[in-house]
């Protein structure tokens, strides 16, 4: 949406509800913040910040920063332009140009597909708490913008809220995706499975990646229907 009144209304809801916003860059920098103040007359969006946080310094070095947050069942996403850290006395804040566009995505009702039995999709990443540990996790299911991964119980746990900057998801021979992930849910599976389900959102997938993921979902659905005949 690009109507100024609608953009302002949604951002005000974020401010009033103290909604967490996940900021991320293509280089893998990430930072969590909230909307502090809105000043559309001056064209400014003000976000809370800890000026001494190293993660924030990495984010400010990037020319491309995306903000993602959730209002109930709706995912909000918008670009942050001219992002700068400002100081006033002992307080710090992030100022950016007021967004001209804001994207809304419905979270609930998104169709998830399980990979076919004769395929073995994986996600390759480094453990967020142990960067020297490279993992290859089995993909349990995928949807547009989301993926569920199997974390074996002999691997150190990964907590909800963790962001993983660089992940390669190989769904089949024709579909390889590069993205970041944020872990939203961790669910222990039944004892025989010996592991947990990580419910993740894909970050910075890009237009080509989203189209490739949609093709994979469509093809998997078609093949599953053919196998059931």
From Swiss-Prot:
Domain PilZ, first and last residues per copy: 134-218
SUPFAM superfamilies to which the protein is assigned, alphabetical: PilZ domain-like
Gene Ontology CC terms: bacterial-type flagellum basal body
Subcellular location(s) per record: Bacterial flagellum basal body
Listed GO MF terms: cyclic-di-GMP binding
Keywords carried by this UniProt record: Bacterial flagellum, c-di-GMP, Nucleotide-binding
Subunit details: Monomer. Interacts with the flagellar basal bodies.
Role summary: Acts as a flagellar brake, regulating swimming and swarming in a bis-(3'-5') cyclic diguanylic acid (c-di-GMP)-dependent manner. Binds 1 c-di-GMP dimer per subunit. Increasing levels of c-di-GMP lead to decreased motility.
Protein name, per record: Flagellar brake protein YcgR
Organism per entry: Methylibium petroleiphilum (strain ATCC BAA-1232 / LMG 22953 / PM1)
């Amino acid at each position: 949406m690009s109507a100024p009144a609608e953009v302002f209304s949604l951002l005000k809801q974020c401010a009033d509800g103290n909604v967490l916003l996940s900021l991320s860059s293509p280089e893998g920098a990430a930072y969590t913040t909230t909307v502090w103040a809105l000043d559309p007359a001056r064209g400014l969006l003000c976000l809370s910040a800890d000026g001494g946080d190293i993660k924030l310094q990495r984010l400010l070095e990037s020319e491309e920063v995306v903000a993602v947050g959730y209002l109930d069942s709706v995912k909000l996403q918008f670009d942050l332009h001219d992002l700068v850290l400002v100081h006033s006395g002992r307080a710090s804040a992030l100022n950016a140009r007021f967004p001209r566009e804001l994207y809304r995505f419905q979270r609930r009702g998104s169709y998830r597909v399980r990979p076919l039995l004769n395929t073995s999709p994986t996600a390759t990443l480094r453990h967020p708490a142990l960067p020297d540990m490279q993992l290859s996790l089995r993909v349990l299911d995928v949807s547009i913008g989301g993926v569920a991964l199997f974390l074996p119980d002999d691997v150190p746990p990964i907590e909800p809220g963790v962001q993983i900057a660089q992940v390669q998801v190989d769904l089949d021979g024709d579909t390889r995706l590069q993205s970041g992930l944020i872990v939203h849910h961790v669910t222990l599976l039944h004892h025989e499975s010996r592991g947990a389900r990580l419910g993740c959102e894909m970050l910075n997938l890009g237009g080509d990646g989203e189209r490739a993921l949609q093709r994979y979902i469509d093809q998997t659905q078609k093949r599953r229907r053919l196998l059931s005949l």
